[in-house]
């Protein structure tokens, strides 16, 4: 997984204050990575093969689960934490409103991909409208979600560093960890680092305390790798 240098995101990637946004950006890059895998799968994979179809379903289900967890953390923990600190700035509050609104637009697109997969499965062996439909809705999801991620990195994430100290941001991270639970957090880290190069993996793992790095290597990654995806 190679970190993408999107236009206008350097402030977010390196932080406008003391808040370390490494894991947030790594998660965004993992979503982009899986969108590429999803599009490639729809274009070329033999979904009539049961084993391949199962691995695609596993990858897609994990993507949806991670996106739901990520957006829920933002909508229920991160943005509400920022709002009182940014109450003096209508521009900043408008950005947070836009982030939440964009999340609402993405959810129906996930359902549309689910429906297109079902249609594709139902038309296997016949004509190709199911295949065409699947490619079309994946294109829409990819365009919408990557646009949202770029918008958030450009305008949303810098608000974290502007509003919170490093200690306050760590406290937000602990709250998200308690909400998600250790097992879900372990799956998240294994998912983020799936296919990561040595430098990116070291940057993300370096944010974990040593016992959790040991858990990643001994438990989370081996468990993650047992399931074929994509």
Per-range role (PLM):
Residues 1-230:
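Small-residue-biased structural context
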